[in-house]
């Protein structure tokens, strides 16, 4: 990759992102534009995947809403993402937790990681 592209990406990656891994429960504050006003919408769920590619980094958050599984992919350095807050650290042994899609109820719970607390 050329030096110019690396420099431009470094300038755009100025946001401080908290350290989180798959299995962690996060609250993502997303900027939503409704008409002429803008508000923040919270999306809370478990991180099931993380993609580290510099400026193109992304992570997938899964939550259960009214008995239906909802997944949303967020670009880590997107201007639409206002804030990422880690609520709970999870202890898992996989990098991609896609198997949670097939689990329901108590089986889909993730053990809390007390060491990283």
UniProtKB/Swiss-Prot annotation:
User: Is the Amino-acid biosynthesis keyword given for this protein?
Assistant: no
Q: Which UniProt keywords apply?
A: Ribonucleoprotein, Ribosomal protein
Keyword Transferase among record annotations = no
User: What PROSITE patterns does UniProt report for this protein, alphabetically?
Assistant: RIBOSOMAL_L19
Q: Name one GO molecular function term.
A: structural constituent of ribosome
PANTHER family noted in UniProt: LARGE RIBOSOMAL SUBUNIT PROTEIN BL19M, RIBOSOMAL PROTEIN L19
Q: Which family does it belong to?
A: Belongs to the bacterial ribosomal protein bL19 family.
What biological function has been recorded for the protein in this entry? This protein is located at the 30S-50S ribosomal subunit interface and may play a role in the structure and function of the aminoacyl-tRNA binding site.
- Cited HAMAP family: Ribosomal_bL19
This protein is called Large ribosomal subunit protein bL19
In its UniProt entry, the species of origin is given as Thioalkalivibrio sulfidiphilus (strain HL-EbGR7)
């Amino acid at each position: 990759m050329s030096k110019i592209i690396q420099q431009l990406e470094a300038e755009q990656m100025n946001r401080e992102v908290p350290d989180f891994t798959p299995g962690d429960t996060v609250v993502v504050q997303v900027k939503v534009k409704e008409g002429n006003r803008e508000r923040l919408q919270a999306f809370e769920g478990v991180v099931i995947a993380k993609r580290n590619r510099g400026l193109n980094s992304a992570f997938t958050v899964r939550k259960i809403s009214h008995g239906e599984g909802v997944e949303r992919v967020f670009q880590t350095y997107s201007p639409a993402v206002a804030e990422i807050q880690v609520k709970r650290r999870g202890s898992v042994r996989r990098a991609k937790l896609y198997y949670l899609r097939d689990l329901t109820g108590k089986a889909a719970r993730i053990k809390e990681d007390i060491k990283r607390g």
